[in-house]
């Protein structure tokens, strides 16, 4: 088994969170879905349209308009919102995420 195969298997078993499904967030989420088809993707976005598209296109497995307990399952979380919102979302995530989450 090659290193790339081992890495792909590892990343396929992980859960990724995306806070923000704009151009950057949705692009990264789509890239993860293409590369790691069996991974789990949790997504937050205020726009219902963006959430519905992510679910419809099978980019996200779960999409919500609030930072909720599902983010506690994430191994990695990507903050893809305008910088001025990051502090707020980090505070929301702090009490939910597991200690090993990056």
Region locations from a protein language model:
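NAD(P)+-binding Rossmann beta1-loop-alpha1 motif at the extreme N-terminus of oxidoreductases
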Residues: 2-66, 72, 76
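Rossmann-like NAD(P)-binding element
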Residues: 62, 67-102
């Amino acid at each position: 088994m090659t290193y790339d195969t081992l890495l792909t298997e590892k990343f396929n078993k992980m859960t990724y969170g995306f806070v923000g499904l704009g151009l950057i967030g949705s692009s990264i989420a789509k890239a993860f879905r293409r590369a790691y088809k069996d991974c789990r993707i949790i997504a937050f976005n205020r726009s219902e349209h963006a959430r519905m598209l992510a679910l419809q296109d099978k980019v996200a497995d779960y999409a919500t308009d609030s930072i909720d307990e599902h983010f506690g399952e994430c191994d990695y979380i990507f903050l893809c919102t305008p910088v001025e919102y990051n502090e707020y979302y980090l505070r929301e995530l702090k009490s939910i995420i597991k200690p090993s989450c990056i």
